[in-house]
Amino acid sequence: MVVTKLATQRPKLPSVGRLGLVDPPAGERLAQLGWDRHEDQAHVDLLWSLSRAPDADAALRALIRLSENPDTGWDELNAALLRERSLRGRLFSVLGSSLALGDHLVAHPQSWKLLRGKVTLPSHDQLQRSFVECVEESEGMPGSLVHRLRTQYRDYVLMLAALDLAATVEDEPVLPFTVVAARLADAADAALAAALRVAEASVCGEHPPPRLAVIAMGKCGARELNYVSDVDVIFVAERSDPRNARVASEMMRVASAAFFEVDAALRPEGRNGELVRTLESHIAYYQRWAKTWEFQALLKARPVVGDAELGERYLTALMPMVWRACEREDFVVEVQAMRRRVEQLVPADVRGRELKLGSGGLRDVEFAVQLLQLVHARSDESLRVASTVDALAALGEGGYIGREDAANMTASYEFLRLLEHRLQLQRLKRTHLLPDPEDEEAVRWLARAAHIRPDGRNDAAGVLREELKKQNVRVSKLHTKLFYQPLLESIGPTGLEIAHGMTLEAAGRRLAALGYEGPQTALKHMSALVNQSGRRGRVQSVLLPRLLDWMSYAPDPDGGLLAYRRLSEALATESWYLATLRDKPAVAKRLMHVLGTSAYVPDLLMRAPRVIQQYEDGPAGPKLLETEPAAVARALIASASRYPDPERAIAGARTLRRRELARIGSADLLGLLEVTEVCRALTSVWVAVLQAALDVMIRASLPDDDRAPAAIAVIGMGRLGGAELGYGSDADVMFVCEPATGVDDARAVKWSTSIAERVRALLGTPSVDPPLELDANLRPEGRNGPLVRTLGSYAAYYEQWAQPWEIQALLRAHAVAGDAELGQRFLRMVDKTRYPPDGVSADSVREIRRIKARIESERLPRGADPNTHTKLGRGGLADIEWTVQLLQLQHAHQVPALHNTSTLQSLDVIAAADLVPAADVELLRQAWLTATRARNALVLVRGKPTDQLPGPGRQLNAVAVAAGWRNDDGGEFLDNYLRVTRRAKAVVRKVFGS
């Protein structure tokens, strides 16, 4: 018979499962402690407290180890845990959060008593005295000194962590993050004082030590230290003394052994500089050599130990330089470099888990705050504070950022720092890496350690994931808003609630710091955008902070802002435009990069704005790549064919060409196309326009019987024939005709010439679009020869009169438009000239070499730099192409694969046939690609054809970015260009025999 117990008689003790203990031996461990036998309220409360530990199993394992240590006094501890709720909260939270502090307690089992009763942390001065007393008490026992100091430091961290964590287990006061960080800095100060005392005694003995000041930097200097962090220091000496460096080195050694790593890398000249300098030496360095980041680092400087008077003199001398740093000539360049360096530090595979360096992470907050301090503290002393939280408050009070934004940024910053603290406490290791999102156990532990509770929809881990996402997004948004929203408020309509601290002068300073060379002009553009009437102005006010931030990373933010204003005014009636930028951040970010890099593409976008909608990604990738050049060509030709009037037909063709050029240029600038793909696409659209113009002109010029007197073919020459057109390339062509049946040559040529002339005139009509110039000067007899010849006339000319340069030009001949069959017959005819069965004559080769030498000395434009002229300069396009063509002239009769109009494909054949060593061919290939990228980039940046790379400066930086260089360092890009072309020139000389 089964007897059911009354509810009041059932055991009160919760089961292992209800306690959340998942280790299989958990039940045995509870039994070992005797916690499973008593059903009184004290034991029930004890077990529920244990269950609330961030990792209850880890806490239980540590308790077992403590109970097994005879020095713990387990009976006393057990009894205290049953009676003292505050002790349970402190001990269980520490053991469930920190494996390292659990190990410390097991190694020092009496330290649990530090967590009993009313725990009061010692003051800054009390800490210093206690650590120095520990040193004094250990005199004569050097072997135990480091151990005793380490134990004392860990005991303090144990107490602080227990107070910090207790609220996760029991209803204990929550210790504010700022208090925890400041208390950790106090401990670091005391530790450094003890280490300095040891070092002075070790190095100086009974003699007076040298006067040294130790300046804390970074988070220690700002009193916002982590549980585990390197402590950055700078040493200042009163005078030169050989003992200075010995004392400093010994201090760092002792501190690193007992407490934490001490790093002096922020000193002048970094690790290569002297460890200790006099104050005068520091002043001289910062006056002459220091970089912007070094002044930024000084924002956190604080004398901590050593000679206090010397430390204050150090601050008095250097801090005025910090507040003037934004006036330095290279301030903007260095700030931009620092911003990019922060982004590049994080490996892509962990970027989403990085608390410090990831997007929306701690460094975003710290960098933004420090930059605003550097810009505005020059004229506002209230901003001259060290800690990030204090600086945010001061910026809000001063009106440099909105008060609500300051409060939100502070809350996000403190939340992220709290997570950082919890991650570091676990093993007392320096880390900023969140657990893998798939590691459910680790995420749950972090959530509980951070006192995050389930919310009814998600468990603690789910709440943490949502909160992290929210905070990262908020930081990212506020990061841009901090920089730009007050600027807009200072110039916007009254409804924007003007930030009272942001004068136009201050706004200009901030824009200058963010990379704008003409800040007052930029403010005018911004004012014009946000002060538009109605909805447009309001939307711009919302959009601009983020758009301006993205644009500030572009090489030319001033030009980009002007282009954005012009584009916005041109599209004022297009409702989709601002909606797209508002709702699709990826589109907006890409557009800002394009506008801030190129003068060529923005002009096209104003007349082909729908291309902007292709800046987003589709299911298969970037929509800019969904368009096939061949499909565009077919559509262009078909569109033109619908108009009987040639001018309207070409206007339609220009519209499609404009759209395609905008697409190609955009994709190129965004790094979505290889340079060879760009050249092929540009060639394709040029050929399509040419075909459309030829078709429409033939239709409009037919005689009454609608029978064309001749067939016409257009032969592409030069880069058009090689499908290697750039943005600024001419289209070199020749026209060939063949009389229709019953039509004599003279009439056929006359009619065909009229067609060719009208096509050239129609395409060459001045336009706001990039020009469509046809150059027919490579035809027989050049400008003096007839524009159109029959096939027979060409054959007769080349057979009898062909000059070496004309033979060379024919190497690039390719039928591109008009009658395809006639075009192919032309190519077969010229094959006899360009690829003769026995090769070209030695005289022809000599003539080619002579012409090449003359071009090098005569054709380079006056004032051009031969080292950086992408077309005619050393190792430039002409060098590579002439080298390839010389080898074709010499060997094409033996190597049929050299019957090829493409430079790159011909280089492949040259290497495969071993006509030139493969390594040399690779040098030629890289030079051609490098020069082509640079030449294309020049047009994209300047908006007009040019071949000369600019000197150092913003324009060269823009060319570097447009050419796909890995950063915007124009000097680095130029060095690479010079190196690649110099090596290629050596190969050119070998091939040409000079």
Swiss-Prot record:
A GO biological process of this protein is: regulation of L-glutamine biosynthetic process
List the InterPro entries hit by this protein, alphabetically: GlnE, GlnE_rpt_dom, NT_sf, PII_UdlTrfase/GS_AdlTrfase
Question: What is this enzyme's EC?
Answer: 2.7.7.89, 2.7.7.42
Ordered alphabetically, the record's keywords are:
ATP-binding, Magnesium, Multifunctional enzyme, Nucleotide-binding, Nucleotidyltransferase, Transferase
One term of GO molecular function:
[glutamine synthetase]-adenylyl-L-tyrosine phosphorylase activity
This enzyme catalyses:
[glutamine synthetase]-O(4)-(5'-adenylyl)-L-tyrosine + phosphate = [glutamine synthetase]-L-tyrosine + ADP; [glutamine synthetase]-L-tyrosine + ATP = [glutamine synthetase]-O(4)-(5'-adenylyl)-L-tyrosine + diphosphate
Q: Which domain of life is it from?
A: Bacteria
Q: Where is this region: Adenylyl transferase?
A: 492-994
Q: Name the coenzymes or cofactors required.
A: Mg(2+)
Answer yes or no on keyword Isomerase: no
Further details from the record: Was identified as a high-confidence drug target.
The family annotation for this protein states: Belongs to the GlnE family.
Q: What is this protein identified as?
A: Bifunctional glutamine synthetase adenylyltransferase/adenylyl-removing enzyme
Q: Which organism is it from?
A: Mycobacterium tuberculosis (strain ATCC 25618 / H37Rv)
Gene name tied to this protein: glnE
